[in-house]
Amino acid sequence: MPKQKTHRASAKRFKRTGSGGLKRFRAFTSHRFHGKTKKQRRHLRKATMVSSGDFKRIKAMLTRLK
């Protein structure tokens, strides 16, 4: 059976944390900031953790991510 490969697009978007979780960056950050409040823009700069519902699916795509 062939080796399972890492999904390269996902590998660029997620990072593994020291405790084994997955860190991701937020959506809605590429343009159209004039419609967002200063508080929204400030919170969009921060990374967040992958939700528990998505964790199993993303972990399967990132088989060899360190």
Swiss-Prot record:
One GO MF term attached to the UniProt entry: structural constituent of ribosome
GO biological process, one term: translation
Residues covered by region (Disordered): 1-21
Keywords recorded for this protein, A-Z: Ribonucleoprotein, Ribosomal protein
GO CC list: cytosolic large ribosomal subunit
Coiled coil: none
Domain of life of the native organism: Bacteria
Entry-linked Gene3D superfamilies: 4.10.410.60
Keyword Ribosomal protein among UniProt keywords: yes
Biased composition (Basic residues): 1-16
PANTHER family, per the entry: 54S RIBOSOMAL PROTEIN BL35M, LARGE RIBOSOMAL SUBUNIT PROTEIN BL35M
Family assignment from sequence similarity: Belongs to the bacterial ribosomal protein bL35 family.
Descriptive protein name: Large ribosomal subunit protein bL35
Organism: Streptococcus agalactiae serotype V (strain ATCC BAA-611 / 2603 V/R)
